[in-house]
């Protein structure tokens, strides 16, 4: 740890671990389960300790814990031309700092993130492939003060829905064409005294494309088109919403690949 101005020091030993299991009910399918516990000691986020009683970096505080559980499955269908995946996940973060009504602080804060992840990868023909993915997640402050400016119990900077789709086709003369779409739900900003900024960003769709040509077995050239319709969107925001990272505008990248 880096000492603060008053020269604080702290040392301890923490154990983070993960365990998992896999079961194959059929040759073409599997079911798995994972569980993990990770711990972050006071000062672990920025390697700085604090003497403030309500600060998570105070060495007298207990480590913050994250417990993550995942249950998923994978199946190969249609002579292995289609792969389907799905997973349920849940993460609980505990021991967060909470200010009590009497002004004292405790580590009763708890946040929860849980959701569902779906994926599909298919080969419609030897030349035509498709990949799709969808994630839905619910987030909330289970115990403690809300963190979102809109007053809801949801967490900030986390879209509820996300989707992606990509398809590609290989022509017999070395040309490959591909295209797809990306969707992200809106992002909530944090609570503070900012005035005039929205409580959340808008959801958005972005479309991309790609073309590549194989010159020979050792070289190919590739052309990527990002944000085809030049959609203006916010990729990320800070707590107040005064600063944000705009999404990538319409752009093109040319690259060459060589294999020896």
Predicted segments with their positions:
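Residues on the lipid-exposed face of transmembrane beta-strands in outer-membrane beta-barrel proteins
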Residues: 19-23, 71-75, 118-122, 132, ...
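Signature of Gram-negative outer-membrane beta-barrel scaffolds
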Residues: 1-29, 42
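Residues that define the transmembrane beta-barrel architecture of outer-membrane proteins
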Residues: 11-15, 65-69, 112-114, 153, ...
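C-terminal beta-signal and adjacent terminal beta-strands/loops
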Residues: 183-192, 212-260
